[in-house]
Amino acid sequence: MATNKLRGLYAITPDRADGARLLADVEAALAGGCRVVQYRDKLSTMPEQVARAQALRELTRRFAATLLINDDLALAALVQADGVHLGKDDGNLVVARAILGPDKILGASCYADFAAAEAASRAGADYVAFGAVYPSPTKPQAANATTELFVRAKAELPAATCAIGGITLDNAPPLIVAGADLLAVITDLFSAPDIMARAAAYQRLFEEAHS
């Protein structure tokens, strides 16, 4: 798997009752330069999830973007997604890698636990996610992940790193400086009055940091 795909804004879909609005919002993020999208849906029925995931697959292909599915290997296979993201209770990473094969992306939630990130990397994870890096309305009980985790991971692990939790344009730069390859954002992106402009602003943070 080409890990150079794993850099920049990582848009995680919000819970939307309106599927058409969800697709329009994701399209706006892609138009703003976002190239990694995770479909996460805790509310819809399975038929709705399949339909939305298929539509997102078509949309991300149009923008040459990466589509990951949250917590569902079967759905990822069904829609030919680029990979999956698994939490600590969502399945064995070694088994997931065996099912996915070598060319799909496997991401793992590691919270504030560097040992978990080491284990995930050994199991074949392409990226490890630390968070919440800031207080998060989506996961208010999440452990606090410090920037030191990203510094250490960059030095010691082959896997890319993802920051998640309470990220905004204002508090994002220290995470990139510390070594975060991906910034996973829900609220600050999809609640923005102009999603395309907000996505573009996040992408510029990476361009400026690596220029």
UniProtKB/Swiss-Prot annotation:
Cofactor-binding details, from the entry: Binds 1 Mg(2+) ion per subunit.
One Pfam family, short name: TMP-TENI
Coiled coil (UniProt feature): none
Binding-site positions, Mg(2+): D71, D90
Signal recorded as keyword: no
Similarity field: Belongs to the thiamine-phosphate synthase family.
Name the UniProt record assigns to this protein: Thiamine-phosphate synthase
Pathway: Cofactor biosynthesis; thiamine diphosphate biosynthesis; thiamine phosphate from 4-amino-2-methyl-5-diphosphomethylpyrimidine and 4-methyl-5-(2-phosphoethyl)-thiazole: step 1/1
Record-level GO BP terms: thiamine biosynthetic process; thiamine diphosphate biosynthetic process
Cofactor names: Mg(2+)
Catalytic activity annotation: 2-[(2R,5Z)-2-carboxy-4-methylthiazol-5(2H)-ylidene]ethyl phosphate + 4-amino-2-methyl-5-(diphosphooxymethyl)pyrimidine + 2 H(+) = thiamine phosphate + CO2 + diphosphate; 2-(2-carboxy-4-methylthiazol-5-yl)ethyl phosphate + 4-amino-2-methyl-5-(diphosphooxymethyl)pyrimidine + 2 H(+) = thiamine phosphate + CO2 + diphosphate; 4-methyl-5-(2-phosphooxyethyl)-thiazole + 4-amino-2-methyl-5-(diphosphooxymethyl)pyrimidine + H(+) = thiamine phosphate + diphosphate
SUPFAM superfamilies reported in the protein's UniProt record: Thiamin phosphate synthase
EC numbers: 2.5.1.3
Residues binding 4-amino-2-methyl-5-(diphosphooxymethyl)pyrimidine: Q38, Y39, R40, D41, K42, N70, S109, K139
Binding-site positions, 2-[(2R,5Z)-2-carboxy-4-methylthiazol-5(2H)-ylidene]ethyl phosphate: S136, P137, T138, G166, I186, T187
Enzyme category, top tier: transferase
NCBIfam families in the cross-refs: thiE
GO molecular function, one term: thiamine-phosphate diphosphorylase activity
Primary gene name: thiE
Biological role: Condenses 4-methyl-5-(beta-hydroxyethyl)thiazole monophosphate (THZ-P) and 2-methyl-4-amino-5-hydroxymethyl pyrimidine pyrophosphate (HMP-PP) to form thiamine monophosphate (TMP).
